[in-house]
Amino acid sequence: MNSDFICLGIITSPHGIKGHVKIKTFTENPQNFTSYGKLTDGITTYEINIIQVVSKNTIIAKINNITSRTNAELLRNKKLFIEKTKLPNLIENEFYHSDLVGLQVILEDNNIFGTIKKIYNFGSCDIIEILLYNSKKSTMLPFSKDIFTHINTKERYVILKLPEIIGSNSGI
């Protein structure tokens, strides 16, 4: 998919025998998953109805025209996208994960530190994985204003203030 689309979730497995599916959502609130309209995998458009919110990022859903477990199984690992223009406008200092991935990470002294590779959330906060400059190694840091002091999505960079515990002589 191109940058005009954002992945809102992925179908992880069938659920039951009636064609329901379990979906891992990437929305802040799983109940918002279907609020923006029909979703697509890039080929097919899906109308989805939430049956149950299972956890903070998992729902059980019914997809129109999917009526059996066999049909639902064919959708396993299918990513579901929405046009970015259908999403609500963000307030200042809010970002979609897809807008941050690929941004160059620059230290406060203007040295290049790396590139944002991926964003995770293990419960307490978002974690930014950074692929280190001129290396195959990566490191992870919490996504906070104290650490990522400036974010410029238009010019595709962030400014990183390394936490005191890490420092610039730690070998990262």
Swiss-Prot record:
GO terms for biological process: ribosomal small subunit biogenesis; rRNA processing. Pfam families: PRC_RimM, RimM. One of its GO terms (molecular function) is ribosome binding. The keyword rRNA processing applies. It is found in: Cytoplasm. Residues 92-167 form the PRC barrel domain. It comes from the Bacteria. Disulfide bonds: none annotated. One of its GO terms (cellular component) is cytoplasm. Keywords: Chaperone, Cytoplasm, Ribosome biogenesis, rRNA processing. SUPFAM superfamilies: PRC-barrel domain (SSF50346), Translation proteins (SSF50447). PANTHER family: RIBOSOME MATURATION FACTOR RIMM. The PRC barrel domain binds ribosomal protein uS19. An accessory protein needed during the final step in the assembly of 30S ribosomal subunit, possibly for assembly of the head region. Essential for efficient processing of 16S rRNA. May be needed both before and after RbfA during the maturation of 16S rRNA. It has affinity for free ribosomal 30S subunits but not for 70S ribosomes. HAMAP family: Ribosome_mat_RimM. Belongs to the RimM family. Binds ribosomal protein uS19. This is Ribosome maturation factor RimM. It comes from Ehrlichia ruminantium (strain Gardel).
